[in-house]
Amino acid sequence: MYDREEEMKKFIILISIYNDWKSVFKLIENIDLQIIDWDAVVSILIVNDASTEDRPKTELNLKKIKSVRIINMKKNRGHARCNAVGLKFLSEKEDFDYIILMDGDGEDRPEELTLLFNKSKENPLKTVTANRKKRSEGPFFKFLYQSHKVLAYILTGKLIKFGNYVCLPKIFAAKLAKQACIWSSFSGTVAKIISDSDRTSVASIKGKRYFGPSKMSFFDLLIHSFSIIAVFRRTTIVRSTLFLIFYLFFVFSNLSIITLL
């Protein structure tokens, strides 16, 4: 008997969450609505980062999504490590063609999934990133975020415009899963390991959380910056040394005799 699913591409959407079950269930329902016309088999894997809130008993009436599974972390490890665990698990255990990573709070808008899907069909061997062209936070946080991007660019030489919202072909998902730096920063590892020629992008608008205010604080943003920089630690050391040498040369070359006295 002919099985059309056998010919379809297999997409797995990887979502990491912590104490945000209400949001992730709403996200799954919205994903199901957005992908209804996809010519693909779609399933979801949730990595639960040792949530302390009980998972509600929710009946999901899904028309397109084939399955929803959950991996439970024994200890809270943070978003980056949950993504790393999910990538490693899927690369070693599952049959798929693409993995799409998403945040579980609604800030990665499911309305943009079809943009990623269509772009991956046009470029089947390339990683597709959702590059932010607009953010939803207030002006102060936007200023801090732009400062973070500039700092990361100065120290790493990489202008990273994307976060976790990325579509990975299987070959690159498996490659990333083997990198030690994936445990520090997903976006930093993508920028380091996957060359510009192997990446393409779609324009993305950061959405608003489904429930409650944004959980990213100034401290979280600092950790995020340092995590990306840590991925490029050798480059950072070299660039920092060169900047220091240039600065000292500039300072000493402009010292006057009066200053020396």
Report the location of each language-model feature.
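Cell-envelope/extracellular polymer assembly enzymes that use nucleotide-activated donors
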Residues: K10-I12, S43
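A conserved acidic beta->alpha catalytic loop
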Residues: N48-K57, G106-E107
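Short, Lys/Arg-enriched N-terminal segments with co-localized hydrophobic residues
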Residues: M1-E7
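Acceptor/aglycone-binding surface of glycosyltransferases and processive sugar-polymer synthases
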Residues: M73-K75, H79-F89, Y98-L101, E107-S184, ...
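Short beta-strand/loop segment that forms part of the nucleotide-sugar
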Residues: A40-S51, I71-N72
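Short, well-formed alpha-helical segments that are part of the catalytic scaffolds
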Residues: D20-I35, D54
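Membrane-embedded multi-pass helical conduit in multi-pass membrane proteins
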Residues: I237-L261
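Catalytic donor/gating beta->alpha subdomain of glycosyltransferases that bind UDP-sugars
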Residues: A174-T236
